[in-house]
Structures are given as C-alpha cells and as structure tokens.
Design a protein with these regions (language model features):
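Loop-helix junctions at membrane interfaces
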Residues: 1-213
Length: 213
C-alpha cells in the first residue's frame, strides 16, 4: 500500500474540488445522463495508489453532500471503489496505453454500476436526484421493477461514464510534465514512457568512432 506523500496530500483537495464542480454542473445544472464526477479520484488513485484514491472518492461525496444537501453521500462507497480500482490499475501499469486505460474504465464502470444500482434501488427507492433519473424512469416503465430499473440504468450509464473519465485522465496525464508525475508514489507506472532520442551520425561518431570506408 502506497504512503501518502506531501505531493499526494496537496493534490487530494484539488481533486475533490474538481470532482464536485464537474459533477454538480453535469448532474444538477445540466441534468445530463452522466456523472463525470470522478476524474479527480481517478487522477489521485492512479498516481498515488488505491488508499489515496479511495479516500479522495469518499471525501468528495461526503463534502458534496454537506455543501449541496445532495444524495452524493449515499454513493460514497462507489466513489471510493472507483479510486481503489484506479489505484490498482495504475499499479499494474494498465494506464500507460490508451487501449488498456479504456478497458480499465469500462471494467470500473461495470463494478461501480452494480454497487450503485443496488444502493439506488434499496436505499433511495430508485431516485438519485440527478440527470440519470429519466433513464431509470424509462426502465421502470418498461419492466415495472425498481431494482431492475436501477441496475439497468447504472449498467447503461456507468461503463460509458467511467470510460470517458479514464480516457480524459489518459490525455490529462500527457499534458503534465513527467518530472512532476514521477514524484508521486505510482507516477513512474502511470507517466508516459520516456522516448530515447534518435542516434544521429554526430552521436555515432562521438561515442563509437568514425565509420570505416
């Protein structure tokens, strides 16, 4: 388990604000059928490990509820789970390539969907208060079962939602300097691989000697 170094502790509040601001705009203001409230959690988890990611996700939802009186705290365990999975995928080197980063997002979304769907069905009566409620209502009209409707809504939205955010993380990481990324506990496992400079004729002559005719 990775320790929380100073840089990680400094990043966590920034990530929490990022989660809350984007999540509030997408789910509450725009009422889109997405969440997009985990980018900061994924960033911390991938760079600093499962513990830091889990704590960031958990605190994001608790603080969000304290600020806006939303239902976010009910899904705090889901947010923590996303951070833990991002940390595990980061530790295993999955987040250096776009293909496996996308797959990590889909797998995380499936796991999150099952947990979130059950929470929504049994604790909230199928209503989350966000932009996905319209989709839940559609499935409820089709199947007549709140549990089935909540699970189908989550399985429809979460894999896409987490795919978008993991891919966004992939490109975000590539916009940051490598010397900063490697200072995080898992930074070397997540940062883009270093590309060796091309060997020029001048370099060849300097290190090996002139070519023989």
């Amino acid at each position: 388990m990775k320790r929380l170094n100073t840089l990680t502790i400094a990043l966590m509040p920034i990530a929490i604000v990022l989660n809350i601001v984007i999540g509030y705009l997408v789910g509450t203001v725009l009422k889109l059928p997405l969440y997009l409230d985990s980018l900061g959690t994924i960033l911390v988890g991938a760079l600093a490990g499962p513990l830091a990611g889990g704590v960031t996700g958990l605190l994001s939802n608790v603080i969000w509820t304290l600020i806006t009186s939303s239902t976010a705290s009910w899904f705090a365990v889901v947010a923590a789970l996303v951070g833990v999975m991002a940390g595990i995928f980061g530790a295993r080197g999955w987040l250096q390539g776009l293909g496996r980063t996308a797959l990590a997002g889909i797998l995380t979304g499936i796991v999150a969907a099952i947990v979130a769907g059950l929470i929504q069905a049994f604790l909230l009566g199928g209503i989350s208060g966000g932009g996905t409620d319209a989709l839940t209502a559609f499935y409820l009209n089709q199947f007549g079962d709140p549990t089935v409707a909540s699970l189908l809504q989550s399985l429809t939205v979460d894999p896409i939602d987490k795919l978008i955010q993991f891919v966004a993380f992939f490109f975000l990481i590539r916009s940051l300097p490598r010397r900063l990324l490697v200072r995080f506990p898992q930074g070397k496992l997540v940062a883009p691989p270093m590309v060796a400079p091309p060997i020029t004729d001048a370099y060849h002559k300097r290190t090996i000697g002139p070519k023989e005719d």
